[in-house]
């Protein structure tokens, strides 16, 4: 009997509510908020729990990407598909990333969240954002592109650099496909290795409530809910704009491609709560790759689109950058002409590519953008430093949802989406087992 048969039978029996991961994570987040609010010092001391969980997940990201991409590409009958999938993915990323930037710009002009602050730029303390500005100055388009090529294969895996691992995985998968039958033993080994690797993912996810509790307790304990009140207009505008983007823009994309955004959100609810609790979309990357494959997207598409999307398809970060930049300009009474705003948009399009899916990366990317746009003072970032952590959750969630949608859409464009399997998955009736080619027989 196959392991898949056993797991499929087990999946048919619904777990009680308290045993479901999304409920456990939701309870953990709530307890973390309460602890951080009423006992801030204890809440701050919970930080290692969140950090440890993220390190555990990052530990397996590189091997999961390598196995998924290498086996997916090596199993392709037509290697030209690799180029087509990559091209369609980049077209999607460029289109919707630019749209997210434009939406942030338009909303900031209409709502004017920074109006009325009347802050003199000369009084701003730039020392609080010097660290972020220094990191931002290290970024350049050439440096970013060169960094995709790893110095050594071992170094790429040791550092956990997603794009470097993806670059090597694609080349290895192509080479494995080109050697034909001689590569069959290697391909079989890698496919067999995927079973314990995905099992490890599910084991680590059981610790998600602990990680979410620690991260949320630290955030509330250190920054306090009260820090949001003074900048509630900015935070509220950002959350509302992100919701608009997810449910209207991405919702329309989903509907056009034959599925519902609400059904997709229900399907990935455990991962969404994990991202909410940790403020890191990377925390749920391995689990998302597994779920997208179970939802009917071919492994080759999943392996290419998701890791690439974590650098090139950051819708939440893009909305945040134009919205935050205009907020700073409005708060310091700096008028930005249409030309200035177009320059801001173009610079943001470049600097947003390569922003990692980790906590705080959006703030560094904003610093990189403002350092090139002379009209808006980088020191103005001090105004939003206190609430950036509370916007980080929304950035990460929007980025995560955007990549889930992108994977299914690109798979459908390429004819690599099993729509019947997707319908079952979104309806909650799918067999929650490993793909057939990575399930060992007895």
Curated annotation (Swiss-Prot):
Q: Which domain of life is it from?
A: Bacteria
Where is this protein primarily located? membrane
* The keyword Transmembrane is assigned to this record: yes
Where is it located? Cell inner membrane
As for what it does, the entry says: Responsible for the transport of dicarboxylates such as succinate, fumarate, and malate from the periplasm across the membrane. This transport system plays an important role in the energy supply of rhizobium-legume symbionts.
Keyword Nucleotide-binding on entry: no
Q: Which GO terms describe its biological process?
A: L-aspartate transmembrane transport
Q: Which UniProt keywords apply?
A: Cell inner membrane, Cell membrane, Membrane, Symport, Transmembrane, Transmembrane helix, Transport
Name of this protein: C4-dicarboxylate transport protein 2
User: Gene Ontology terms, cellular component aspect?
Assistant: plasma membrane
Can you name the source organism? Mesorhizobium japonicum (strain LMG 29417 / CECT 9101 / MAFF 303099)
* TM helices/strands, residue ranges: 20-39, 52-74, 89-111, 141-158, 162-179, 200-221, 231-253, 342-364, 368-387
């Amino acid at each position: 009997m196959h392991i898949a048969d056993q797991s499929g039978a087990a999946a048919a029996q619904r777990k009680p509510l308290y045993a479901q991961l999304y409920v456990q994570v939701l309870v953990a987040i709530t307890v973390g908020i309460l602890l951080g609010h009423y006992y801030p010092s204890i809440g701050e001391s919970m930080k290692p729990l969140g950090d440890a969980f993220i390190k555990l997940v990052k530990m397996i990201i590189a091997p999961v990407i390598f196995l998924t991409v290498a086996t997916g590409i090596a199993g392709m009958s037509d290697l030209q598909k690799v180029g087509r999938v990559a091209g369609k993915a980049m077209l999607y990323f460029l289109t919707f990333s630019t749209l997210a930037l434009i939406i942030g710009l338009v909303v900031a002009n209409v709502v004017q969240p920074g109006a009325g602050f009347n802050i003199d730029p000369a009084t701003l303390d730039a020392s609080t954002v010097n660290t972020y500005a220094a990191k931002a100055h290290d970024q350049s388009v050439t440096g970013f592109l060169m960094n995709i090529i790893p110095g050594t294969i071992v170094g790429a895996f040791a550092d956990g650099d997603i794009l470097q691992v993806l670059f090597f995985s694609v080349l290895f998968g192509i080479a494995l496909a080109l050697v034909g039958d001689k590569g069959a033993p290697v391909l079989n080994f890698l496919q067999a290795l995927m079973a314990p690797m995905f099992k490890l993912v599910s084991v680590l996810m059981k610790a998600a409530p602990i990680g979410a509790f620690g991260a949320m307790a630290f955030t509330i304990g250190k920054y306090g809910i009260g820090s949001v009140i003074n900048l509630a207009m900015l935070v509220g505008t950002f959350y509302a704009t992100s919701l608009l983007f997810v449910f209207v823009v991405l919702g329309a994309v989903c509907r056009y491609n034959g599925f519902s955004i609400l059904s997709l959100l229900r399907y990935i609810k455990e991962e969404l709560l994990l991202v909410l609790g940790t403020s890191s979309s990377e925390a749920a990357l391995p689990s998302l790759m597994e779920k997208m494959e179970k939802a009917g997207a071919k492994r080759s598409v999943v392996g290419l689109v998701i890791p690439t999307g974590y650098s090139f398809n950051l819708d939440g970060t893009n909305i945040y950058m134009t919205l935050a930049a205009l907020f700073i300009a409005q708060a310091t009474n700096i008028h930005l002409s249409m030309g200035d705003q177009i320059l801001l948009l173009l610079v943001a399009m470049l600097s947003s590519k390569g922003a990692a899916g980790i906590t705080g990366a959006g703030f560094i990317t904003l610093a990189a953008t403002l350092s090139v746009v002379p009209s808006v003072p980088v020191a103005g970032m001090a105004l939003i430093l206190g609430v950036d952590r509370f916007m980080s959750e929304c950035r990460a969630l929007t980025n995560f949802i955007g990549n889930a949608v992108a994977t299914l859409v690109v798979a459908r464009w390429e004819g690599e989406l099993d729509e019947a399997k997707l319908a079952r998955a979104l309806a909650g009736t799918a067999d929650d087992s490993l793909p057939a080619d990575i399930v060992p027989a007895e």
